[in-house]
Swiss-Prot record:
Organism (species): Potamotrygon cf. henlei (Freshwater stingray)
Coiled coil (UniProt feature): none
GO biological process: defense response to bacterium; defense response to fungus; innate immune response; killing of cells of another organism
Keyword Lyase found: no
Phosphoprotein keyword on record: no
Entry protein name: Antimicrobial protein PcfHb
């Protein structure tokens, strides 16, 4: 079955949203790791 344009747009929108959240989560994870490394150096 072929998707309609509106279905494709919706899927693309959801996919973009998921990707953005994953990228944000990875970035936050990296920031947390750096913060931990820095704080352990100072204590």
């Amino acid at each position: 079955g072929k998707l309609t344009d509106s279905q494709e747009d919706y899927i693309r929108h959801v996919w973009d949203d998921v990707n953005r959240k994953l990228i944000t989560a990875k970035a936050l994870e990296r920031v947390n790791l750096v913060a931990e490394a820095l704080s352990s150096n100072y204590h």
